[in-house]
Design a protein with these regions (language model features):
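N-terminal "domain-start" segment that seeds a small globular fold
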Residues: 1-19
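Thiol/selenol-based redox catalytic cores and closely related redox-interacting motifs
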Residues: 80-82, 86-163
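A generic fold-level signal
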Residues: 1, 20-22, 53, 100, ...
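Short loop/turn microsegments at loop-to-beta-strand junctions
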Residues: 3-4, 26, 148-150
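Conserved helix-turn-beta segment immediately C-terminal to the redox Cys motif
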Residues: 24-26, 33-34, 38-62, 81-85
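Thiol-based oxidoreductase modules, predominantly thioredoxin-like and allied folds used
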Residues: 30, 52-74, 87-99
Length: 163
């Protein structure tokens, strides 16, 4: 099994087989529009523009599971991303990325690449980890997605190589 075996729905409601990305490097990101990490959209878009002609695809998957930081509709989220960050990479419809009913793609990704710990050198991590311990200790358990903007790097053969 690989990411190419999954079909996901775009913000526009179109079903897309991830097999269309065969031979490309894919960065899959769970996103949110009202998060301390939201400015990462700018860096992701810059990365996409710089490397898309060399075979990079970035796929964004909004989720409202972490402190309800993406409460808008798919249309509102897409508009926010375009207006504020000029996002041109493919965004998919909002859905769960962890818990009892995650999107199948995210169940697969987290099974393939478990959680290795937070990067405590990141300026937000020293604030995020204590908040999670206090308010959402269940998030810290297991290999599920821990917060917004978790990234999975997929190689040109469809293998999950990094989280």
């Amino acid at each position: 099994m690989s990411v190419y075996d999954f079909t996901c729905t775009t913000m526009q409601g179109k079903e897309v087989s991830l097999s269309q990305y065969k031979g490309k490097v894919i960065l899959i990101v769970n996103t949110a529009s009202k998060c301390g990490f939201t400015p990462q959209f700018a860096g992701l878009e810059k990365l996409y523009k710089e490397y898309k002609d060399k075979g990079l695809e970035i796929l964004g998957f909004p989720s409202n599971q972490f402190n309800e930081q993406d409460p808008g509709t798919n249309e509102e989220i897409q508009e926010f991303c375009k207006v504020n960050y000029g996002v041109t990479f493919q965004m998919f419809k909002k859905g769960d990325v962890r818990g009892d009913n995650p999107q199948p793609l995210f169940a697969y990704l987290t099974k393939e690449k478990g959680f290795k710990g937070f990067n405590m050198d990141h300026p937000i991590a020293p604030k995020l980890v204590p908040m999670l311990k206090e308010k959402h200790p269940e998030i810290l358990e297991g290999d599920g997605i821990k917060w917004n903007f978790t990234k999975f790097l997929i190689d040109r053969e469809g293998n999950v190589v990094e989280r």
